[in-house]
Regions:
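Amphipathic alpha-helical dimerization/coiled-coil segments
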Residues: 83-117
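Electrostatic, structured charged patches in enzyme active sites and in nucleic-acid/phosphate-binding
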Residues: 103-354
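Short amphipathic alpha-helical segments
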Residues: 43, 92-97, 165-173
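Short, basic interhelical loop/turn and adjoining N-cap
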Residues: 37-46
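Short amphipathic alpha-helical interface segments
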Residues: 5-38
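Accessory beta->alpha helical hairpin/"wing" motif in late/C-terminal subdomains of nucleic-acid enzymes
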Residues: 48-83
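Ser/Thr-centered flexible coil motifs
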Residues: 14-15, 69, 166-170
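Short, Lys/Arg-enriched N-terminal segment that forms or immediately precedes the first helix
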Residues: 1-10, 82-85
Length: 354
């Protein structure tokens, strides 16, 4: 290989190394260190220092986080990723939250770079609310607090980053997700409540369940209670793995067949919200890796009405301790999905995508 060819190869490798961080910062505008430290694959410290040193990224600010420079946006355009340069804002905290969700999706292999409902309706990806608000003639969100939308088959989840003190116009949020679902031809809707951890997201909901404030203006807890689905997401690598599995079409069926018995007979047994019967305990079980609080509650009601003494929640290993706190024994039991079924599920999804 000639010297010129080697130089081009080195430049290509450098560009590929820079690209995830540059695209994510350019897209989200402000990303804080709390987020970047949780995703070192994209934002390792040596890379960030290099980007600052070469004038692509501004020095880190506790107030505004990581931001691209004019040269940074120019670099993206040169590499066929043109983006609107940053406009100064005092709402950087909200941008930090938006970025945490977008980066988690990116780490899960879900593109957060959708910019219109039309584009989003054709692909099962993630549509950030900030991209919709920035688009011309796309003011479909108004003053809604939604962070973004993700399609999982026929289900549309509206992502929110809840705060206990933040008030929600309940019907307006419901109307928003229903309207987007109709435009995307989704038949089911729900919410994805995001936070730095499962605990922080759940605490915001719990506060709202305790302190009701009215019919129109409510809390995130009320929003969750009125939903068909209320999933929790931790904005880190664990949450990214959760989303990666949730995105696999009909993932519950193959897992149910690998983990238990009678997976095709739940409706006849009066347990339509359950997934299978545990072969050892002979009790109904539900796959809970999606952390769907509403689904778990429905399954619990059905199991009790059918006369069972337990409902088994089968989840990922890092979800177990949290689930044990909010769904305690003796009625609830928490099981862990072994690595082998997870591996087979991922292998099947990889083959199907080829």
């Amino acid at each position: 290989m000639s010297m010129g060819g080697k130089k081009e190869e080195v430049l290509f490798v450098i560009a590929q190394d820079m690209l995830p961080a540059m695209r994510l910062i350019g897209w989200c505008k402000n990303i804080d260190q709390s987020c970047t430290s949780r995703f070192p694959e994209f934002f390792r410290l040596s890379l960030m220092r290099s980007l600052v040193r070469n004038g692509f990224v501004r020095p880190y600010s506790a107030t505004y986080g990581w931001r691209l420079t004019t040269d940074g946006y120019r670099w993206l355009e040169m590499h066929d990723y043109p983006m609107q340069p940053d406009q100064h804002t005092q709402r950087s905290k909200r941008r930090f939250e938006n970025a945490a969700v977008a980066v988690t999706m990116f780490a899960a292999g879900i593109s957060p770079f959708m910019s219109s409902i039309r584009e989003f309706s054709q692909q099962d990806e993630y549509l950030p609310a900030f991209a919709l608000r920035a688009g011309a003639n796309q003011n479909v969100l108004g003053s809604n607090l939604v962070t973004g939308f993700i399609r999982l088959g026929d289900t549309l989840l509206a992502a929110h980053y809840p705060h206990a003190e933040r008030r929600v116009l309940l019907q307006r949020e419901h109307d928003c997700v229903q309207g987007i679902a109709l435009r995307c031809r989704c038949t089911d809707t729900g919410y994805l409540f995001c936070g730095e951890s499962y605990t922080s997201a759940y605490r915001a909901l719990l506060h709202g369940q305790i302190k009701s404030v009215g019919k129109k203006s409510g809390t995130y807890g009320q929003l969750a209670n009125e939903a068909s689905h209320a999933c929790l997401l931790s904005c880190d690598l664990q949450g990214a793995f959760q989303m990666k599995l949730m995105r696999i079409p009909d993932y519950r069926l193959p897992l149910s067949m690998m983990l238990g018995e009678q997976s095709g007979q739940m409706i006849e047994m009066g347990l339509p919200a359950c997934d299978f019967v545990d072969p050892r305990l002979h009790q109904p079980a539900i796959i809970s890796l999606d952390m769907d609080l509403c689904h778990i509650k429905r399954a619990a009601v059905q199991a009790r009405e059918a006369g069972y003494s337990n409902l088994i929640l089968v989840a990922l290993d890092f979800q177990k301790s949290f689930l044990e706190q909010i769904f305690p024994p003796p009625f609830f039991r928490i099981g862990i999905i072994p690595d082998e079924p997870i591996g087979k599920l991922e292998e099947g999804a990889a083959r199907a995508s080829v």
